[in-house]
Amino acid sequence: MGQNDLVKTLRMNYLFDFYQSLLTNKQKNYLELFYLQDYSLSEIADTFEVSRQAVYDNIRRTGDLVEDYESKLRLYQRFEKRRELYNLMKQSLNQPELLKQYITQLEELE
């Protein structure tokens, strides 16, 4: 798996965590098997007795859908920003003014 594939898989795992409640059962099943359990398209197709192309199309469309949700709701983006601020805050415990700035930024995310 290349670096780009790994980054995409990690991103899709996060997006799935954030937006799975907005997906149909079939969409959830396909994404979970493909991205979380590392099933191949053929394995998923065999499991659900459909073609590889049907699985591929569903995964691609569902991936586009969760990306669309993210562009509108930005849950993952805000999560990443909060995580970044948390790490900066841990490093700034002895710098109260800097810590206050990070807290303000964190509050603005809500």
UniProtKB/Swiss-Prot annotation:
Leader sequence residues: none
One Pfam family this sequence matches: UPF0122
InterPro entries per the UniProt record, alphabetical: RNA_pol_sigma_r3/r4-like, UPF0122, UPF0122_fam_protein, WH-like_DNA-bd_sf
Cysteines engaged in disulfide bonds, as pairs: none
Similarity comment: Belongs to the UPF0122 family.
Annotated function: Might take part in the signal recognition particle (SRP) pathway. This is inferred from the conservation of its genetic proximity to ftsY/ffh. May be a regulatory protein.
NCBIfam families the record matches: PRK00118.1-2, PRK00118.1-6, YlxM
PANTHER family: UPF0122 PROTEIN CBO2450/CLC_2298 (PTHR40083), UPF0122 PROTEIN YLXM (PTHR40083:SF1)
Listed name of the protein: UPF0122 protein SERP0802
